[in-house]
Amino acid sequence: MFELPKLDYSNLALSPIMSEQTLDLHHGKHHQTYITNLNNFIKGSDYEKLSLEDIIKKSSNEKKAGIFNNASQHWNHNLFWKCMKPNGGGNVPSKLESKIKEDFGSFEKFREEFINAGVTQFGSGWCWLSLKEDKLVVTKSPNAENPIIHNMKPILLSLIHI
């Protein structure tokens, strides 16, 4: 069964970008609810033996909305919390920066494309930097959808909540 991951930082650590109240709501309530729902949906089923990524792929193809939405949001939030850090920002790891420049032409062009994807997402969703085959791509997705179901490997994401 799946569990809420412990954060690598305190609930105050992301202020002023994310308040303690907002972090508590998204981590302790929303994320926990996705996990509780997912565990309830898969208990006693073949899904119970699968990895989270395999549950996402299989439930997406089988049109199991309850399982898919909760599994995918659990996965999305897991990556989201890993993308956040106190006093965030700073330098991009050199290997990733080189790949961004190779695939987008410059870091500035990537940044512009990533921001544009985020601000043009209609309603709640996610903005992603993913590896598709051997190329970095920026995508956006509504609600629980994520690049895993499109055979991409997500690297970075931003939450868009309207």
Residue ranges of predicted features:
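All-alpha RGS (Regulator of G-protein Signaling) helical domain and cognate RGS-like helical scaffolds
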Residues: N40-K49, K58-A71, N76, F80-K132, ...
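A broadly conserved detector of short glycine/acidic/proline-rich loop/turn motifs that flank catalytic sites
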Residues: D8, E133, P142
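Conserved small/polar residues in nucleotide/adenosyl-binding loops
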Residues: I160-I162
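Alpha-helical and His/Cys-centered functional microenvironments
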Residues: Y34-I35, W81
